[in-house]
Design a protein with these regions (language model features):
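Glycine-rich, basic loop-to-helix element that forms the pyrophosphate-binding segment
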Residues: 70-87
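The conserved acidic donor/metal-binding loop of glycosyltransferases
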Residues: 96-100, 127
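Conserved donor NDP-sugar-binding/catalytic core segment of glycosyltransferases
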Residues: 104-138
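Conserved nucleotide-sugar donor-binding catalytic segment
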Residues: 126, 140-227
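A conserved acidic beta->alpha catalytic loop
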Residues: 30, 38-48, 96
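Cell-envelope/extracellular polymer assembly enzymes that use nucleotide-activated donors
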Residues: 2-5, 33, 188
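Short aromatic/hydrophobic "clamp" motif used to bind/position activated sugar donors
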Residues: 92
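N-proximal low-complexity "stem/linker" segments adjacent to membrane-targeting elements
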Residues: 1-26
């Protein structure tokens, strides 16, 4: 049976963290560790996490292991790197505070995509629904994952949501987030993981199901302009300046035609 490390990084997340903790705890798949990395929050985030862990210890039927640390960091992706270092599962998934699994058997569905005794795929990936801060469905994510994903596909945008991207932990730990890419460090990371999977001859496998409810209004949306600049830098790094400019020109033309 494959194992999962679910990494949740928090900072001042008292309004969102409880939903995510409960969603992970409700997963019926047993082979899960939840790695919680807090950036020394000053609100009630750490209190809520510590209460959750204490409650788990009183429940002998609790299915999952929880790993937790709170300390200052250099931002979200530095915290994610700390989480990667602590991950011990076969696959790692980043689930931000406020994000949830759509079903209690979501991880069972993901695990079921890997055959018994099969060489583990490099990446497992699925679809995404966008929800509001009450968990109400808003829309299906506009970008739809392709059937046969390649790192080259990301030149057209982040076709798989970061929170729907299950990377083999050994690949992920060899490709830590590069902080110089700012709010688009997740795009760069996904591309590099897929490149490494290709180099090792590992498949990228679709799940054909919604695997995450993504909380609307993430950091890249709140800081849209700086995120776009960082993303252009990522695209240029992986696909070259000419291809990146051509793709962005097409984005502009398409946007104009839709008006």
């Amino acid at each position: 049976m494959i194992t999962f490390s679910i990494i949740t990084c928090t900072f001042q997340a008292e309004k969102e963290i409880q939903r995510t903790l409960e969603s992970v705890a409700q997963q019926t798949y047993p082979h899960v560790e939840h790695v919680l990395v807090d950036g020394a929050s000053r609100d009630q985030t750490t209190t809520l996490i510590e209460a959750y862990i204490a409650a788990q210890r009183t429940q002998p039927e609790a299915l999952h292991r929880t790993v937790y640390r709170s300390e200052p960091d250099k931002g979200l992706y530095d915290a994610m790197n700390k989480g990667l270092q602590r991950a011990t599962g076969d696959y790692v998934l980043f689930l931000n505070a406020g994000d949830t699994f759509p079903q209690t058997d979501t991880l069972e569905q993901v695990a079921g995509a890997v055959g018994e005794g099969e060489m583990l795929p490099g990446v497992l990936y699925g679809d995404t629904d966008v929800v509001d801060n009450t968990g109400r469905f808003l829309r299906h994510r506009r970008l739809v994952p392709p059937e046969n994903l390649s790192w080259r596909d990301f030149k057209w945008g982040m076709l798989v949501c970061h929170q729907a991207f299950y990377a083999r932990t050994d690949l992920a730990q060899c490709t830590p987030y590069r902080l110089q890419f700012g709010l688009s460090a997740d795009v760069d990371w996904c591309i590099r993981v897929m490149k490494m999977a290709e180099q090792k001859g590992l498949v990228l496998r679709p799940i054909h199901a919604v695997v995450v409810n993504y909380l609307d209004g993430g950091m890249s949306i709140k800081h849209h302009r700086s995120s776009l600049k960082a993303r252009f830098h990522v695209m240029r790094t992986h696909y070259g300046l000419l291809t990146t400019c051509a793709v962005h020109l097409w984005f502009l033309i398409r946007s104009f035609l839709r008006k």
